[in-house]
Amino acid sequence: MAKEIKKPVKVETENPMRAVKLEKVVLNCGGSAEKLEKSVKLLGLITGRKVKEIASNKRIPSFGVRPGLKLGCTVTIRGEEKLKLLKRLFGAVDNKLKRKKIKENHFSFGIKEYLEIPDMEYQRDIGILGLDVTAVFVRPGKRVILKKAKRGRLPVKQHVTIAEIEDFVTNKLGVELE
């Protein structure tokens, strides 16, 4: 009588290291002097966070740019607020995103006037301004390129592809792709 050897049954589970998640949402607004002050107020009003002003590093005489000249401002949103904010900002563009705006690991879109954002009212001291929105995606394992000791490289297979971002945007955010 021969013993029958049972092979373990493999359960098809999704690899947790292949999961795609939204890392951060970055809002950016440019301008110099008076427009920069208005941009800082606008981004603070939209996010409720502290805004960082961006200064130039290079000298470009044809544009009148010198090192240390403040040219724009930015806010990075992480944590639980990022999805709520991104859904709200997509409301300004009628929940639509052009496919050509999606790149590997991120997508970006612009909002021409902040008045298009739901629940935003006209602010007399700000006037009419627009802003840029960038959403960055990541997989687990990115720490390899961020750590100081024994730093490694992120292989191409760990990048988030355009198709995966399209899937995330349509399923989780309910955005229509054009």
Q: What is each stretch, according to the model?
A:
Residues 2-178:
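Ribosome-associated RNA-binding proteins
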